[in-house]
Design a protein with these regions (language model features):
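Basic, short loop/linker segments at the boundary and entry of helix-turn-helix/winged-helix-like folds
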Residues: 1-51, 70-73, 98
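Acidic/histidine-rich, metal-coordinating catalytic segments
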Residues: 159-174, 194-196
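DNA-recognition alpha helix
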Residues: 57-70
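Active-site beta-loop-alpha junctions of metal-dependent nucleic acid enzymes
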Residues: 82-83, 133-158
Length: 272
């Protein structure tokens, strides 16, 4: 009965070094704004209705014509959104958020051309800002590493063991933690909250952290549903990055007394 004593090992080898990949690539859509027919004010109206008010591109075009008398195609609205996302993404990704030492991570699914894709989110559980995100066609460890790298990059000095990273029970997170220790010598505490009920002391203590990012997922999904899915991988990434810009800098939050999470002087003095 030798088969009873056979040992099985799972061996993982990464063919891509996710720690050398560029976190902040420049999109081909990142160009200057030149308006042939419309102007920056109309573009601002497009983004306000489309992103802030959760309207689809067709609904946005319809409202602009019915309310403002501006005849614009839904394709132009989509192009404005893609260009704005490409231009503002570097600012959002490299802003100094001054994060706390409790991060929360989760993933949710979206559709790209009818095929399931995944959005990875890492947020500051205390200050509520989104620090890292990725869009991928798989639920593998690679995109998880990239999202975590983007979040850790916000620290001027990595806190090490003082950092508590809270996630669900998915296996990608401990594998990513292992790679950070091997490749960058970054050690941090990973806490996995498993299940929907508090069956153990860990879940009871850190359930609130997990619920913060789950509420964020629901907030994003309410804006995502009107899109009926994205048309390309790049469109999905830049569509989500535009929503992150709105969430971090424009959306009123009860946590901050119904003011945006990160207030900018340039926005405070700007008119509508």
């Amino acid at each position: 009965d030798k088969y009873k004593y056979k040992l099985h090992y799972i061996y993982r080898e990464f063919n891509i070094n996710f720690f050398k990949m560029d976190l902040y690539p420049i999109s081909k859509h990142a160009t200057g704004f030149t308006f042939k027919k419309f102007n920056p004010h109309i573009m601002g109206l497009c983004l306000t209705y489309h992103v802030n008010c959760k309207m689809s591109t067709r609904q946005t075009a319809h409202v602009l014509e019915e309310v403002h008398g501006i005849k614009i195609s839904h394709r132009t609205v989509a192009n404005y959104a893609l260009t704005a996302a490409a231009v503002i993404k570097p600012f959002v990704d490299t802003f100094n958020y001054k994060p706390s030492k409790i991060l929360s991570a989760d993933e949710t699914y979206i559709k790209v051309k009818g095929i399931k894709h995944y959005v990875w989110i890492v947020m500051d559980a205390c200050k509520k800002s989104i620090l890292g995100y990725q869009v991928s066609d798989t639920r593998a460890t690679g995109p998880c590493i990239l999202a975590m790298r983007m979040a850790f990059d916000k620290f001027k000095e990595f806190p090490g063991k003082a950092l508590n990273f809270v996630a669900d029970g998915y296996s990608a997170y401990p594998l990513a933690k292992q790679q950070f220790e091997l490749e960058e010598n970054k050690e941090f505490n990973l806490t996995q909250v498993i299940g929907l009920t508090n069956e153990d002391p860990v879940s009871e203590e850190f359930r609130w952290v997990k619920q913060v990012v789950e509420r964020l997922n629901r907030t994003f999904k309410s804006s995502y549903r009107v899109t009926c899915g994205y048309g390309s991988d790049e469109g999905a990434l830049y569509g989500f990055s535009l929503w992150v810009a709105y969430y971090n800098f424009l959306r009123p939050h009860p946590y901050n007394y119904h003011r945006p999470l990160n207030e900018l002087d340039a926005l405070n003095i700007a008119d509508n």
